[in-house]
Structures are given as structure tokens and as C-alpha cells.
From Swiss-Prot:
Assigned keywords, A-Z: Ribonucleoprotein, Ribosomal protein, RNA-binding, rRNA-binding
Protein name: Small ribosomal subunit protein uS4
SMART domains referenced in this protein's UniProt entry, alphabetically: Ribosomal_S4, S4
Function: One of the primary rRNA binding proteins, it binds directly to 16S rRNA where it nucleates assembly of the body of the 30S subunit. With S5 and S12 plays an important role in translational accuracy.
Gene Ontology terms: biological process: ribosomal small subunit biogenesis; translation
Regions annotated as coiled coil: none
Similarity comment: Belongs to the universal ribosomal protein uS4 family.
Any GO MF annotation of the entry: rRNA binding
Subunit comment: Part of the 30S ribosomal subunit. Contacts protein S5. The interaction surface between S4 and S5 is involved in control of translational fidelity.
GO cellular component: small ribosomal subunit
NCBIfam families attached to this UniProt entry: PRK05327.1 (NF003717), rpsD_bact (TIGR01017)
Domain of life: Bacteria
Amino acid sequence: MARFTGSTWKKSRRLGISLSGTGKELERRPYAPGQHGPNQRKKLSEYGLQLQEKQKLRYMYGINERQFRTIFDRAGKMKGIHGANFMALLASRLDAVVYQLGLARTRRQARQLVNHGHIMVDGARVDIPSYQLKPGQVISVREKSQKLNIIAESVELSNHVPEYLTFDADKLEGTFVRVPERSELSAEINEQLIVEYYSR
């Protein structure tokens, strides 16, 4: 299954969650496209709820089904709670951290910055969005890319960096201090439904 590249706004409204991270998709019409009001959303079956939750998280991170399942299976081999491990692995991806550092306004934008070679890890350019960061690694913007308007505007508008990261706005440099705890990640996702989906 290919990575979703269609209308993020329509998909956000259908799933009831902001996939861009800005929340703007749901401000005017917080209900699915094609509906005539907020009270006409279909009641889903148990399977439907599980599938919807999987799609929410997959589209949120903008990854295809194969990548998503690979990370899920890897999380299952780790010590601890499967779902929490899964969420932590997703949040430890390079593109996810670039977004959380405030170097990009949206997750899609963060992925593009990585793809186009603007981001460095420990001084070396990394252009793989799925690159899994380890505690202590330093994320920075390539010198030639530091004057990009897209980055400057994002940093200026950013006002919060999670506690598992540190960020120096003057240097455009951040550190992945530690693996995030579940309580520090999206409360809009019920990962247990995803565990149940893949356990069917």
C-alpha cells in the first residue's frame, strides 16, 4: 500500500484528527466530508474502530503499510508494552523529531526537509525520514539550508519542545535526549486498538 499523498484536510476530517499537526483542518468543519452536519458520522463496528485508529496513526506519520507493520512488529519484540513501544518508535523517527523540534510546520514538511538533504545527524547529512534516532544524537540544519524561509518561519512560530528533546534556536540544533514516554505522545491515539487490529 502506497503512502497517502492526497488531501490531508479531507482525510483529517474523515478520521476526526489533525494529520498536519496544525489543527486548522477541523476548525471550520469538524466532521467528515460529505456529511451535512457534525452528528451524522456513522457508528463503526469493533473492526471498523480498530482499522480507523490504525489509519489515523499511519496517515499522521505519513508512512506506508509495509513500513508501519515493520515498526509494529519490531515494537512487539521489545521489552515493555507493545503499543507504547510502537508509539515511541514512531516518535523517534528523524522526520518526527524534526517536526517536534519546530523546524517544520507540518509532518509532511519535516519529511520533505529530510528527503531534500537539509537535515544532519551528528554532523552527517541524513536524507532518510525513517532514520531511527538514538538518545544523545544531535539533529541540526545543514549550513547551506539555515537561511531557508520555511525553517526560519517554523522556528519563529514554534513555542514548545517536548521534554525528551532540547533545542537551540540560534544554532538550529537539537538533541534527542531520550526515548519519549507514552504520556508525552498524542493522547488522540488509542494504540491498543491497533494492537487488537493486528492480533485478529
